[in-house]
Amino acid sequence: MATDAAEKANILAEALPYIREFAGKTIVIKYGGNAMTDDALKEGFAKDVVLLKLVGMNPVVVHGGGPQINDLLARVGKQGEFIQGMRVTDAETMEVVEMVLGGLVNKEIVSLINKHGGKAVGLTGKDGHFIRARKLFLKTDGDEDVDIGQVGEIEAIDPALVSLLDSQDFIPVVAPIGVGVDGEAYNINADLVAGKLAETLRAEKLVLMTNTPGVLDKQGQLLTGLTAQRIDELFADGTISGGMLPKISSALDAARNGVNSVHVIDGRVKHALLLEILTAAGVGTMIRA
């Protein structure tokens, strides 16, 4: 018992330099994957976020919800379709996306954080029009436009609402839904929202939680550190593809635009968030410009 207590005290003491370094800093966290579907991991994530807030950091959560969207689409007889890692979103699918992301998933995360002593507030980009978007067209190899429905790209993010919540000790929980000039809702990739929000808020860190140990090479080995040049090479040779494309593109843009460090971590590891931010070892892949 005494040994266990001493070990816990040592862990807290080792975290002190990181707590001091990041006090008052903004940490944007993209929350997704298995960490959102496993009950123990969900509880652990909520506790981690509350702890970061209590020790003086400003965590901002941006969440996905792909599996939950797929489940509801299946229940209404629709099958999800993806092109270049982006969900094709017709009007009916957009209704499901708003119900799942802005309602079910967002409110569950808010409730879990509040259950563990935080003060979380759920938002979509339609609140205060703080995520302004326009219709996204993908490009074919022949440079032709591909219409994927109500999928948006970010025009601008107004940081005032999130900054206000941070300053009043609330924890913003953001669903990746943007709004056009005509009030049209747009489904936006959550990794892109997290990256652009981190840039706009001048965040110290952007943490992207995934279902892999981090960025892997073609042999399945973890790449613990990546530069912009190396990422360009991995794009070119196809090592980074599919759903990882928007994730790593967002990470690289954030690193190039003022976010001090970006981390792609394994959300299947309990307390991965604390391991990354409050220990020397860290986990996953660190990306710098």
UniProtKB/Swiss-Prot annotation:
Q: Which residues, if any, are the signal sequence? A: none
Q: Which reaction does it catalyse?
A: N-acetyl-L-glutamate + ATP = N-acetyl-L-glutamyl 5-phosphate + ADP
Q: Where does it live in the cell?
A: Cytoplasm
So, what pathway does this thing act in?
Amino-acid biosynthesis; L-arginine biosynthesis; N(2)-acetyl-L-ornithine from L-glutamate: step 2/4
Question: From its record, what is one biological process in GO terms?
Answer: arginine biosynthetic process via ornithine
CDD domains reported in the protein's UniProt record: AAK_NAGK-C
Site annotation (Transition state stabilizer) points to 30, 247
Asked if the record carries the keyword Disulfide bond, the reply is no
**Enzyme Commission number, as recorded:** 2.7.2.8
Which cysteines link up through disulfide bonds? none
- Determine the domain of life of the protein's source: Bacteria
Recorded hits in Pfam families, A to Z, give: AA_kinase (PF00696)
UniProt binding sites for substrate: 65-66, 87, 187
Give the record's keywords alphabetically: Amino-acid biosynthesis, Arginine biosynthesis, ATP-binding, Cytoplasm, Kinase, Nucleotide-binding, Transferase
Q: Which molecular function GO terms apply here?
A: acetylglutamate kinase activity; ATP binding
- Which InterPro entries does its entry note? AceGlu_kinase-like_sf, AcgluKinase_fam, ArgB, Asp/Glu/Uridylate_kinase, Glu/AcGlu_kinase, NAGK-C
Q: Which NCBIfam families match?
A: argB
HAMAP family per the UniProt record, alphabetical: ArgB
Q: What does this protein do?
A: Catalyzes the ATP-dependent phosphorylation of N-acetyl-L-glutamate.
Hey, which family's this protein in?
Belongs to the acetylglutamate kinase family. ArgB subfamily.
Which protein is depicted?
A: Acetylglutamate kinase
